[in-house]
């Protein structure tokens, strides 16, 4: 690798499913071979930081790195420098995330990266545009949800981001509010971020350790040894759960598995075996319920494409119940599933993270405590004006879990080996 060169290399496109992956027609992501690990990353000394960059503040940190908001002294341009600890990630995984993010940056609904990629002695580093309003999770009132107009603006943009990705045969695999960055708190401008788990359609991946409410049932059921083939349906499912969350301020279930009473009730409704609606779905209008039936179809092949939500957005999604305090604290008598002792609803939203056991994987964020020390922002010339993101906005990767004091770094967990 080149050492001490002041100019960053242009961003390269890398395999999204491991070394030597075959090209995907129309995918828009040029694929290289194992030589990707020989790509030049500029090695820079942290001592030069004050020469080019001003540290504004730390945006977040975790066991595998940190994110700093910096300003380039020459122009005042703000950017988020993302430091990934070398002891917690492989070079190929870091380069893959940067490459995929760059390849998708032509979409106005996907976070952009600056032409700044380098390494320090302890970290790999790249720069993203800064989203000043934080992430979508930050603005969702627990057990209340966002105003419907705000939700529709957000859903429209996310649908376009997913449609763009899926048209290139890429699957995000970690759709959730924490990975949607905001440029204003009314969701007039939002962008999808965090592509560390992104893989192309058909790529076979290992199952993660544990599940989160956004995880599709076929992923929950996949064997750890066999894994599963990546499909756009996992994004569509997570998109449906996300829409439920932003409208209600609650999860629909804790996990899409038979052990969850609320998911089982939903399954019975989807299969026409439940008279009436599950209690937590009664606030939605008929068009909204049809939308959820499509997005959350139990069989992946029956899920509609993400862009199908557009035809439902012209309708009201929630009824008058939406304007009342959450009525999900307890299920009404008679709504309990046979043989189930569980009465409490899944509860208000909380931040979620996936983990994978095995070398090279990124661990779950710590409850509290210091992170392995990482260098302060390193001087790299700011990109040309034409490459800089428009009026870059706030946090791109770091965030704090307000409910539990957890520090969460938004980089998605590496899963595919």
Swiss-Prot record:
Residue ranges constituting the Protein kinase domain according to the UniProt record: 53-318
CDD domains linked to this entry: STKc_SBK1
Sequence positions that bind ATP: 59-67, 82
Entry GO terms, CC: cytoplasm
Biased composition (Pro residues): 363-382
One Pfam family linked to the record: Pkinase
Intrachain S-S bonds: none
Active-site residue list: 174 (proton acceptor)
Record carries keyword Nucleotide-binding: yes
Region (Disordered): 321-405
Location of this chain's protein in the cell: Cytoplasm
Claim: DNA repair is one of the keywords in the record: no
Keywords per UniProt: ATP-binding, Cytoplasm, Kinase, Nucleotide-binding, Serine/threonine-protein kinase, Transferase
EC number: 2.7.11.1
Catalysed conversion reaction: L-seryl-[protein] + ATP = O-phospho-L-seryl-[protein] + ADP + H(+); L-threonyl-[protein] + ATP = O-phospho-L-threonyl-[protein] + ADP + H(+)
GO molecular function: ATP binding; protein serine kinase activity; protein serine/threonine kinase activity
Family statement: Belongs to the protein kinase superfamily. Ser/Thr protein kinase family.
Function, as annotated: May be involved in signal-transduction pathways related to the control of brain development.
Protein name in the entry: Serine/threonine-protein kinase SBK1
